[in-house]
Amino acid sequence: MQPDLHCRTLAAHTLKHFRALSPLTHCMTNDVVQTFTANTLLALGASPAMVIDPVEARPFAAIANALLVNVGTLTASRADAMRAAVESAYDAKTPWTLDPVAVGALEFRRRFCLDLLPLRPAAIRGNASEILALSGMALGGRGVDTTEAALAALPAAQALARQIDCIVVVTGEVDYVTNGQRTLSIPGGDPLMTRIVGTGCALSAVVAASCALPGAALDNVASACCWMKLAGQAAAERSEGPGSFIPAFLDALYHLDVEAANATN
């Protein structure tokens, strides 16, 4: 199955809908990236909410437009809150996205993520090692870092997408987005995106928010990946290093004009 290059014209159209809807996105994410994730969503036009207590997480997941579950700093109590939120989202038909951070490196989070899969995530976003581990095809990875190229994990992503009936995103130098039948490739970005903490986690939040949009989920999620790649490229051109990249990246998301990027690339 050959990946198709994602159409930036479609990404531009999807971004207009995204900004008009401003999806209320319930982010149960890790402690390291809370602020960056919220600012990324705000810069693009979404409405983030970082609700984590189990008493609040269950009812809030039912009223949000989308839910993100990121297991980066998983604890037993946080797992209980996440499970409650996912069960509520499932009952309310709120689309939820799983970011299985370091799932191949630690057994507790691997079992937790596998236990959530029957509750039908709308999307799963991970690096190659994480997707391989979640699919059962490999275990390993250096914590949150990948030891595999994204393309190497594509067969696992396609099989997982068919098994769960969801969208699976494998991120890397080129991102691959698949529903198991059709696969889209999104090149771009910049190496500076790997020199700061949180770009992958923030992408998962944007993917989650995009799942709230009407239309084809595959195209919406691929558009989310395209937005982040374009913003990363634009920010890198204005940055001297990781310290100046972060504010430049948020500015690039805020001013993102995919149609203008099409005209100059």
UniProtKB/Swiss-Prot annotation:
Keyword Nuclease: no
EC number: 2.7.1.50
Binding residues annotated for ATP, in chain numbering: 125, 171
Binding-site residues, substrate: 50, 198
Alphabetized Gene3D superfamilies for the sequence: 3.40.1190.20
Known cofactor(s): Mg(2+)
Signal peptide as annotated in the record: none
Keywords, in A-Z order: ATP-binding, Kinase, Magnesium, Metal-binding, Nucleotide-binding, Thiamine biosynthesis, Transferase
Superkingdom of the organism of origin: Bacteria
Gene Ontology molecular functions: ATP binding; hydroxyethylthiazole kinase activity; magnesium ion binding
Family to which this protein belongs: Belongs to the Thz kinase family.
Record NCBIfam families: PRK09355.1, thiM
Function as written in the Swiss-Prot or TrEMBL entry: Catalyzes the phosphorylation of the hydroxyl group of 4-methyl-5-beta-hydroxyethylthiazole (THZ).
Protein name: Hydroxyethylthiazole kinase
Species in which this protein is naturally found: Salmonella heidelberg (strain SL476)
